[in-house]
Amino acid sequence: MSETSSPHRSGSVAVIGRPNVGKSTLTNALVGAKVSIVSNRPQTTRHRLLGIATFPEGQLVLVDTPGLHREQKRAMNRVMNRAARGSLEGVDAAVLVIEAGRWDEEDTLAFRVLSDAGVPVVLVVNKVDRLKDKTALFPFLAQVSEGRTFAAVHPVSALKRKGLDALVGDLLKLVPEAEAMFGEDEITDRSQRFLAGELVREQLMRQLGEELPYATTVEIERFAEDGALLRIGAVIWVEREGQKAIVIGKGGTRLKEIGGKARLQMERLFGAKVFLETWVRVREGWSDDEAALKAFGYSE
């Protein structure tokens, strides 16, 4: 009796949740490469991006999104919320990422957005490795699931890559039988230029922590190949002179540290030597100016 192989499946899955629950860490873990920057600061992800996770059984095109939140005062917050909601258009399924042991109003908001979209929702309970009392997990899952419908529920640790195989198996069941949309070596739809800017922004968040002004973004002014060398020029935009001084640091030491670590990350990701220059410039009110946001690459 001959064995029949399972059909190949391929489809898109939106990764949704409130800020700082580990959506980007989960996306990177599933893709197997760094396509989305990560920090402890909420709202690290500001753009929709595709992470392409390819397995022998199929391919998942993951739409990593900005965290859904209630803050609507700044234009940047409104644009990011619209981007998160817009990521649900045309997807086959969605992942709602929450933090183990915690459910708040923003989690409820994210669930309502997914319910309105009418797509199958897989609940991913992340950071289970941080639970001090492991016996509290099952009562928490029962509480969250009460009155809410999920296609599957998966406790995971995205950081430690625990519980991901079972999650992938259930996600592949929710996408259609189809050929892969991308080549097996492709991991994202974003350009190297975009990723370079994100790596600088990641180091800004990691080096400055709570000192980092919220209204900070990065624009890549130059990205050029010079033989085996990549020459990259990055502008860090802030809204006030005082913020500029914070980013530069005493004697330029902080900016040098940011640039040095971002360059190493770029060389690792791009597989090439990088010459990186960084500047800090001021543009007042850019984070509440939709035209400026569009110029800096923020879109819905």
From Swiss-Prot:
Stretches the record annotates as G5: 156-158
Function: An essential GTPase that binds both GDP and GTP, with rapid nucleotide exchange. Plays a role in 16S rRNA processing and 30S ribosomal subunit biogenesis and possibly also in cell cycle regulation and energy metabolism.
Residue ranges annotated for the KH type-2 domain, each copy included: 200-284
NCBIfam families xref list: era, PRK00089.1, small_GTP
Compartment(s) of residence: Cytoplasm; Cell inner membrane
G4, as annotated region: 126-129
Protein family according to the UniProt entry: Belongs to the TRAFAC class TrmE-Era-EngA-EngB-Septin-like GTPase superfamily. Era GTPase family.
Region feature (G3): 64-67
Family annotation (InterPro entries): G_ERA_dom, GTP-bd, GTPase_Era-like, KH_dom-like_a/b, KH_dom_type_2, KH_sf_prok-type, P-loop_NTPase, Small_GTP-bd
Cross-referenced PANTHER family: GTPASE ERA (PTHR42698), GTPASE ERA, MITOCHONDRIAL (PTHR42698:SF1)
SUPFAM superfamilies xrefs: P-loop containing nucleoside triphosphate hydrolases, Prokaryotic type KH domain (KH-domain type II)
Its membrane topology: Peripheral membrane protein
Keywords: Cell inner membrane, Cell membrane, Cytoplasm, GTP-binding, Membrane, Nucleotide-binding, Ribosome biogenesis, RNA-binding, rRNA-binding
Full protein name: GTPase Era
Stretch list, region G2: 43-47
Biological process per Gene Ontology, one example term: ribosomal small subunit assembly
Subunit structure, as described in the record: Monomer.
All residue ranges annotated as the Era-type G domain in the record: 9-177
Region (G1): 17-24
Single GO MF annotation: small ribosomal subunit rRNA binding
PROSITE patterns named in the record: G_ERA (PS51713), KH_TYPE_2 (PS50823)
